[in-house]
Design a protein with these regions (language model features):
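Bacterial Sec-dependent N-terminal signal peptides
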Residues: 1-40
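N-terminal catalytic cores of secreted or lumenal carbohydrate-active enzymes
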Residues: 61-235, 256, 266
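Structural preference for beta-strand elements that scaffold enzyme active sites
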Residues: 94-98, 132-134, 183-187, 234-239, ...
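Conserved, mostly hydrophobic/aromatic
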Residues: 97, 129, 186, 238, ...
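Active-site neighborhood of glycoside hydrolase catalytic domains
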Residues: 216-234, 244-350
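Carbohydrate-binding surface patches
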Residues: 428, 439-477, 488
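C-terminal beta-strand-rich structural cap/linker in extracellular carbohydrate-active enzymes
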Residues: 485-495
Length: 495
């Protein structure tokens, strides 16, 4: 019998007797006062079930409600998802995706009614609840060409202009902002400084930011923020550099952990603060899970650097040299830096093939990553392009990829992949500021995560990636509801 409730750093409650252990506050509260009392407050509650099941062609289908009945000690032979609302962890900042040049250009090639449909599908009241928008500062691979916002060799940055973005990107971002409302959360990432600031004199294929341009480049971020905010787009945050360890055929720039730290400590951080942008959330790393712990522990080892960083961003592409995703590196990093939030800043399925856009494996890739990322402490989750065309682009270096929504710009047809529905099982029902609560499974084939929304709704997402149908039980403090988890399905249960 427990006599303590564990609650992670970041709780707004004013408890007494806090003691910091392993990055979490252990709060001394009597068992009979607050522990194991979910059903005392929620007697008779049923669970609404939403299911996506590829074999039955069901997509976010309402399956009715399930009742909870007394269920004592589960046996090892009984499949269960265990949820304990007493154990509370990180709060959700939000879920969303990137509005890149490619997404925006594709968007404005579509008929007006399709544009409206896509905005509603992601950001509207009947959509899947996206609140996060990421974009690129300067060009990236998902641009139609390379570009910057200044004339060559303009160290004064007097020529700075975001006119390029006003044609497609800014209008689409503002459409999303209008639909989202107050929860709109926008951040940006640079892929490369202008070529003349770099060691290789190219925006492509890596290279480094030359030392003499560190401050000029820091000032560039300020210009970008001011121009976007002048247009009514409030900037919530930024990453220092997209994928700082990748020498790509597209826009890229290399920083070691020490170099990123020096740039943040001596240039970017002070420049943001000096210009009144202390509230902007700076995220370091913004690359794969494989090196996240090493980068964080190195870059943030200096308190004078760490004070400028609010979060640690990461991508999912470590499988290029690993068989599986390295989720455990996230929890290790979170334990090391309980005062920094973890942010998934990019992921997509590469090697686009139009004939495979309805494969359920696309959705399962997203479900597997989202559930594990949240269970390891992630507070913000951002997909890559929200929209791409029938080629998986446009992309000026031929790096064509999948997206949750694919639009055929020749016919005007809009395709919703399983990526869209699997993400929606999380993003539509788990709201910003929801708090993750304790969840585990006694079957490897079933993975799950749970959050408590601010209105008291308890939301559990369960995925079965196996080839077998599984009957399971959603078990909460001695009460359980029977659920069917069909092969290759995902479901959301809302209490």
């Amino acid at each position: 019998m427990r006599s303590k409730i564990h609650e992670c750093v970041g709780s707004n409650k004013n408890e007494i007797g806090k003691k910091l252990i392993a990055g979490c506050f252990v709060i001394g509260i009597a068992f009979n006062a607050n522990a194991q009392d979910y059903w005392k407050k929620n007697a008779g509650k049923t669970g609404k079930v939403i299911l996506t099941h590829s074999k039955a062609n069901e997509k976010m289908a309402d399956k009715g409600s399930v009742k909870f009945e007394k269920f004592g000690q589960p046996k090892e032979t009984e499949a269960c998802i265990f949820v304990d609302p007493d154990f509370k962890y990180q709060k959700l900042i939000g879920i969303g995706g990137a509005i890149t040049d490619a997404s925006a250009e594709t968007f404005y090639k579509l008929p007006k009614n399709k544009q409206k449909e896509i905005i509603e599908a992601y950001y509207g009241k009947n959509g899947i609840g996206y609140t996060i928008v990421r974009t690129n500062m300067n060009s990236c691979d998902f641009s139609s060409d390379s570009y910057t916002y200044v004339a060559d060799n303009d160290t004064s940055l007097k020529s700075f202009s975001v006119a390029h973005d006003e044609k497609y990107k800014i209008p689409m971002i503002k459409e999303a902002q209008k639909a989202i409302g107050n929860n709109f959360t926008f951040y940006f990432s640079p892929w490369s400084p202008p070529a003349w600031m770099k060691s290789n004199k190219s925006m492509l294929k890596g290279g480094r930011l030359e030392n003499q341009y560190y401050q000029t480049w820091a000032d560039y971020y300020i210009k970008f923020i001011k121009e976007y905010e002048k247009r009514g787009i409030n900037v919530w945050g930024l990453t220092v550099q997209n994928e700082p360890m990748a020498t790509q055929t597209w826009e890229s720039c290399i920083y070691t952990a020490e170099e990123e730290g020096e740039f943040l400590k001596n240039n970017l951080g002070p420049t943001l603060w000096k210009n009144g942008y202390k509230d902007k959330k700076v995220m370091i790393w913004d690359h794969n899970r494989d090196l996240i712990y090493q980068r964080a522990t190195t870059t943030l080892s200096d308190p004078e650097t760490s004070k400028y960083a609010a979060g640690i961003g990461y991508h999912w592409y470590e499988t290029w040299n690993n068989k599986t995703q390295l989720f455990d590196n996230l929890s290790e990093t979170q334990r090391a830096f309980p005062d920094k939030f973890l942010a998934f800043t990019e992921g997509c399925k590469e090697q686009f093939d139009m004939s495979k856009i309805y494969d359920v494996s696309l959705g399962e890739l997203y479900g597997r990553n989202m559930i594990n990322d949240f269970n390891k402490g992630t507070a913000l989750w951002t997909d890559w392009n929200v929209l791409l065309d029938e080629t998986g682009g446009p992309n000026h270096v031929g790096n064509f990829c999948f997206a949750p929504i694919i639009a055929d710009t020749k016919t005007g047809e809009v395709h919703y992949t399983y990526e869209y529905y699997y993400v929606g099982h999380v993003s539509k029902y788990i709201k910003p500021n929801a708090q993750r609560i304790g969840t585990s499974s006694n079957r490897a084939a079933l993975i799950a995560t749970s959050f408590m929304n601010e209105n008291g709704q308890l939301v559990t997402v369960i995925m079965n990636e196996s080839d077998q149908d599984i009957e399971t039980n959603l078990w909460i403090e001695g009460m359980a509801a029977k659920l069917q988890a069909p092969a290759h399905s995902i479901q959301t249960v809302i209490l």
